[in-house]
A protein has these predicted regions:
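Alpha-helical transmembrane segments and their membrane-interface exit regions
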Residues: 124-132
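Helix-termini ("caps") and immediately adjacent flexible loops/tails
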Residues: 1-101, 109-115, 133-151
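Hydrophobic alpha-helical transmembrane segments
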Residues: 112-125
Length: 151
């Protein structure tokens, strides 16, 4: 797997520097996993595109995050390999929207006060965190979890 090139003046932009280091950690975590050559080639294409960017500006930061998301989506879809707390973060939002809002709506309608609509959000969030944490634990037990967390 290809490596990110060393950038001398990236330390001037703190956000870009942190994102670049995080992408490097993701690539290091992926090297431990045995990935097919097809997947490695796709990841290498993403890295080559990022290495070809010479200027460090706001578009560079956007490109780093885009490449990181592309790599995470690729390995999740093809191999079901996910970073730590991937499902917890995903299901927390799903729980709030799929369970929390309808529960709050029912609660608000039963009391007759739509101001209570927001009361379902923390309930849905708790349900989502519970479901996501159990899925993360299952992924860890099956060896499908990377030693890397998206921040």
């Amino acid at each position: 797997m290809k490596k990110l090139i060393e950038r001398q003046n990236i330390s001037e932009n703190l956000n870009a520097s942190n994102a670049y280091q995080q992408l490097g950690k993701l690539l290091n975590a992926l090297e431990v996993k045995e990935l097919p050559t097809e997947t490695v080639d796709l990841i290498n294409n993403e890295i080559e595109e990022l290495n070809s960017i010479s200027e460090i500006d706001k578009y560079f930061l956007k490109a780093i995050k885009e490449k990181e998301n592309n790599v995470i989506k690729l390995i999740e879809k093809k191999h079901k390999i996910v970073p730590r707390n991937y499902y917890r973060k995903l299901w927390m939002i799903l729980g709030m929207s799929a369970f929390g809002i309808p529960m709050g709506l029912v609660f608000g309608l039963s009391i007759g006060n739509f101001g209570m609509l927001g009361i379902g959000l923390p309930i849905g969030m708790a349900i989502g965190v519970g479901v996501g944490s159990s899925m993360d634990k299952k992924a860890f037990n099956q060896g499908r979890q990377l030693d890397f967390e998206v921040k």
